[in-house]
A protein has these predicted regions:
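N-terminal "mature-domain start" segment
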Residues: 1-19, 23-32, 89
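Signature of long, low-cysteine stretches enriched in small and polar/charged residues
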Residues: 6-7, 11, 19, 37-134
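Phenylalanine-focused residue identity feature
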Residues: 8, 31, 108-111, 134, ...
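Residue-level detector of solvent-exposed, low-hydrophobicity positions
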Residues: 15, 38, 115-118, 136, ...
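Short linear sequence motifs
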Residues: 24, 101-104, 127, 137, ...
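Alpha-helix boundary/N-cap detector
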Residues: 26-29, 46, 151
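Short, low-complexity, polar/charged sequence segments that are solvent-exposed and flexible
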Residues: 28-33, 83-86, 162-166
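Surface-exposed amphipathic alpha-helical segments
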Residues: 138-168
């Protein structure tokens, strides 16, 4: 904590999550190739460009509102009861999203991206800044996500950037 600004960082074991999510794809050649790259901790330059191109096409280039909870449609004879609406609509607005890019000067291949966010929960809005880094540590790839209320990026952005570069 810095008084007015708060931040937290979470680390996600990418290999473990990939294995749990894709159990049914364990024999898929693309999954096997992806897991081999995660084990090796390296992606060749051609694959890197293909991956970055594919990922960056999915990143919003303009302000985008993402609903976090949507109405649920259920089967019902009464059309009035066919949709269950959430009590408050929660959204995440993505602004100034940065493209995923390689980070120079790191021990392991590292890729980073960041964005300003606006979390809205009914009448309450919380501006945030998120900075993420994917570190391809051999055998133990990790996704680090830092989130802060420092939306001006004066205090925590340099801290996040230096932390992601110094991962050993």
């Amino acid at each position: 904590k810095t008084g007015q600004k708060d931040a937290f960082v979470v680390a996600v074991d990418v290999k473990q999550i990939a294995q749990q999510v894709a159990k049914e794809k364990a024999n898929d050649p693309m999954f096997i190739a992806a897991m081999a790259a995660l084990d090796k901790g390296q992606i060749d330059p051609v694959t890197e460009q293909l991956l970055l191109g594919t990922i960056n096409k999915q990143i919003p280039t303009s302000t985008t509102v993402v609903p976090l909870n949507r109405p649920i449609n259920v089967s019902s004879r009464d059309p009035q009861k066919a949709t269950i609406m959430p009590k408050t609509l929660k959204t995440l607005t993505v602004e100034n999203a940065e493209q995923v890019h390689p980070v120079a000067g790191t021990k392991y291949q590292t890729y980073a991206a960041s964005s300003r966010l606006l979390y809205a929960d009914g009448s309450v809005q919380t501006p945030l800044y998120a900075n993420a880094a994917f570190v391809l540590k051999p055998g133990k790839p990790v996704l680090y996500v830092g989130i802060t209320t420092d939306v001006q990026r004066d205090y925590f952005k340099p801290i996040f950037d230096n932390a992601f570069k110094s991962i050993k």
